[in-house]
């Protein structure tokens, strides 16, 4: 007779899926979570039952791919960072070679992404289990948000005199953009400037009149 410990271990071990089925389940759960975030605007109250119901699978199916809701939200957050990077890259590629125009484009793209996908934007920085800056920006190119920040850092460097350290300015731009997004959400009645005007004024304050 198997021991109680062995039985318990067997019951909690994730089952293997047929080849290809696991990937489809993984993708469908992330997609379902993304749809619910778009509809709800945040992850508050988002449940395993709601996600699996949207994905058309049983609640227990989630545990075949993820340890729980926190791990699923981390996966959705990672994918959202990739989407934000793609969104900013597309804005950059649509510009010419003018450094200020390129920085304007990716700064606006950052804000537009947050406006269009508020639920995804919120979990970028508030996902359960995240270890702050170490995991977001990472070390040795491992951070999930490093591509996004590197775009801003490189574009900032192009607007500064050669040899200048772009890090302090890039951090100030990032925190200001994040603050603009966050405050507009909680203070919608305040007379906020248009995104384009705000970004232009922000850059003028740092780099002077273009």
Pin down the residues of each PLM region.
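Short secondary-structure transition hinges
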Residues: 112-154, 182, 189
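Alpha-helical structural segments
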Residues: 24, 28-35, 54, 71-94, ...
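Hydrophobic alpha-helical connector segments
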Residues: 89-119, 146, 163, 170-173
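Helix-turn-helix
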Residues: 28, 39-71, 75
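N-terminal intrinsically disordered/low-complexity leader segments
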Residues: 1-24
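Amphipathic C-terminal alpha-helical segment
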Residues: 174-192, 206-210
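Amphipathic alpha-helical interaction segments
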Residues: 28, 50, 105, 109, ...
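Amphipathic alpha-helical packing segments from all-alpha helical-bundle domains
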Residues: 89, 133-161, 167-171, 197-208
């Amino acid at each position: 007779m198997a021991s109680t410990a062995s039985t318990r271990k067997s019951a909690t071990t994730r089952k293997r899926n047929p080849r290809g089925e696991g990937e489809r389940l993984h993708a469908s759960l992330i997609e379902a979570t993304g749809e619910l975030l778009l509809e709800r605007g945040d992850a508050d109250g988002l449940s395993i039952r709601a996600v699996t119901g949207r994905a058309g699978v049983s609640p227990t199916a989630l545990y075949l791919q993820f340890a729980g809701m926190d791990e699923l939200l981390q996966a959705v957050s990672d994918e959202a960072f990739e989407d934000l990077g793609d969104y900013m890259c597309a804005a950059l590629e649509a510009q010419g070679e003018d450094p200020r125009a390129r920085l304007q484009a990716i700064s606006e793209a950052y804000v537009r992404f947050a406006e269009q996908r508020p639920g995804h934007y919120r979990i970028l920085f508030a996902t359960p289990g995240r270890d702050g800056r170490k995991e977001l920006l990472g070390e040795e190119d491992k951070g999930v948000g490093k591509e996004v920040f590197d775009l801003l850092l490189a574009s900032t460097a192009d607007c500064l005199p050669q040899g200048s350290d772009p890090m302090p300015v890039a951090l100030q731009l990032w925190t200001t953009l994040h603050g603009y997004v966050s405050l507009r959400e909680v203070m919608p009645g305040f007379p906020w400037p248009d995104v384009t005007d705000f970004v232009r004024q922000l850059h003028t304050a740092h780099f002077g009149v273009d």
